[in-house]
Amino acid sequence: MKPVKQSLLAAAVLAAFLVPAAPAFAQHAEHVVIAQTTATAKATETGAALRDLWVGHIFWVRNVVVETLAGNKKAAAAAEKEVVANAKQIAGAIQPYYGKEASEKLFGLLAGHYGAAKQYLEATAEGSKAKQDAAVKNLTGNATEIAKFLSGANPNLPFDTLNGLLLAHGGHHLLEIQQLRAKQYAEEAQTWEAMKKHMYVIADALAGAIAKQFPAKFS
């Protein structure tokens, strides 16, 4: 098993162990590699831009988590505004290929993703297992909806593969929240590194699939 696959599977298994209500994260974490295209300068540039946007997503969500757990409502609200702005940028990145309606659809789905993560954060801070379980269900369902949407738009993004990537990403959010809540800072630092690498996998998969679907735009 390749190192990337091992890290994703390990993160998902940890999330499932710490959150028994989320076995789906463990079941779908290991994924097959999406077929890659020969990189052109524009494809490389697009991939780098998507990496930056997806890392921005986890950066600002982490800030929301940190400030919420610290009780700093003003800072948490400021970070949340950045989460929303980042989601609009990620959604906007697909508009040149799929149109405004698709961009707006993706933004709504990304908003749902963040909403479920925030729901889990608040439930964890409150200590409510029932609310945690509800949040996990919402996060899992949202991952499936995003995978359906993107795989439907691009045949180079197999649903099962994309769903696994998104479920593993959700598992990272849960694990990070739990570790920060428990003040397990050294462990969370390792989770953060795994999250960044996973964002690269997702960004590269999206960029490669788009370049393959629209070769004329990348020639």
Give residue ranges: language-model regions.
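Bacterial N-terminal signal peptides that target proteins for export
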Residues: M1-A10
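N-terminal leader/presequence segments that precede the conserved core
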Residues: P3, P20, E30-H31
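Structural motif marking the loop-to-transmembrane transition
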Residues: V4-K5, T46, A102
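C-terminal segment of classical bacterial N-terminal signal peptides
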Residues: F17-F25
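C-terminal amphipathic alpha-helix
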Residues: E30-H31, A35, K42-A76, E80-V83, ...
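Mid-chain, structured segments of secreted extracytoplasmic proteins
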Residues: V83-L121
